Amino acid sequence: MIIETFDNTTQEVLKELEKTQKQFWNISRTTAEFLYNIIVDSKAKSVVEVGTSNGYSGIWLGKALKKTGGRLTTIEFYDKRLDVAKENFEKCGVADIIETKRGDAATILEYLPEDFKIDIAFVDANKSQYIKFFEFIKPHLNVGGYIACDNVISHAAKVQ
């Protein structure tokens, strides 16, 4: 398992965050490992996460990006969640490669600099805005890049 390759502190933080999965709407470990592998296998350098929450997925993305020499830009609307995430990024040794943005994701994505390029985008936020997020991310996506959206099947009615 990938988690066993992480330092003890990161393993402990991730296991604690897994206990709050429903409260903070975190992805499953299986999904986290899948995203980790996509980043490492594709040698992604620029990843954007929409929906930071408490940082669970961001830690996984950050650990993968440490292997590829990349950076993560993560966006969260709620102040308290982003503050918790920042603490978790520090504890897990990924804060140095993560840029956090606080605010409305659609607005932040809409006004990304024209030359901002994305290898992989992971969207796990307000389901009713997924199509809008996609439209703002697509012009920045590098050839061969990926956009992964969580809950598109389980929350299909909200995504449309």
Q: Can you name each region flagged by the protein language model?
A:
Residues 1-122, 127-148, 152-160:
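A short alpha-helical cap/connector motif
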